Amino acid sequence: MNIVTSGNIDSSSTVAMSMRKFRNFNFEMDSYSGEKTPDQDYGRSEDKFNLPNFKVPFEFREPYILTGYRKPEISAQECLQSSLSRCNETINVWSHLVAFAFVLVRSMVVLSEHNPLEDPFAYPMISFVVGTSAMFLMSSGAHLFNSMSSKTRHVCFFFDYAAISVYAFSAGQAFYFYSRPLKPDWVIFRSYPSFVALCTIVSCVSLSSCCASRHRWIGHKFLIRTGTFMASFFINTSPYWVRMWDCQSDMDCNAVSIPYFKRQALFFAIAALANGSRLPERLMPGVFDFCGQSHHFLHILCAIGTVDEFTALYLDMLGRRKALELSHVTPTFANSLLLTTVVLVANVAIVLWFTRAIKSNDTACKKKT
């Protein structure tokens, strides 16, 4: 009799353990599906900035990053607190915040030597500083506050893409005024309206493509974003590339700015390769969650490259000024600062359009339910 009872108890225990394992398996599968189940627990309050990927909805996850996620729907204050914690966004926030501070201090030094109120030749440099500062500041903000809600996450990165597009345009403007060939054979470099129109179109198209990639072409979103911004980089820096390729004077062929420009291009190329391939975390998921993931390389290398870009432009601004002032076009408020403002407004309008589209989709989903 005792033997039978023990057998029954053992069988019951085995069945109970199997049922628990089955429920746990179902829980993990539901978590990975991207839908938060009623039983989904975000853990203790001290762990809300270091959650595993299966405890956050799918749209808050990054490929091959397994830990270090913040609890979705946190407040702005909690987002600020998370910047001092060990989460997978910490380095993204601080890398570009430090870069923003560096560019701001350096620009103050440069502009103190070239008063823009008295020197219109400094206008393109101001545009570049505005674009660069906006890019770094919006990047930090997007990575800091993207866990507040699903819609906030999309809007944060919409503005991040817009800031990158404005930066690229401002860089193109500065490269045209400071680094273009002195005697270009290409028609587009002899016509500033044509060049700046192309840069404007590229800015708007790249922003629209990146915003759309958050809802379409999800499987190729990193390639789309990296590809559009790399194309924008080559178009906006084309005055310098053509100048190096077809230099016709000692000033163009032996410019002191060339090493800085080449180094910037190298840093940007490595950053694009890492971001597009998702290396190294693709090879060892979970190892580089806090430090060393591809987006960290993107942030840090782009920051260093942009500093080199700043140096290259400033050296050309100083060394080529006399020759450029004899050319057919020179900077004015209208063709530099005002034009950058127009492009900025156009990019903000695109962001607002995509933001409204999110609201419309949410409303449609609620009506269906």
Regions found by a protein language model. Name each.
Residues N2-T369:
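Multi-pass alpha-helical transmembrane bundles in non-GPCR membrane proteins
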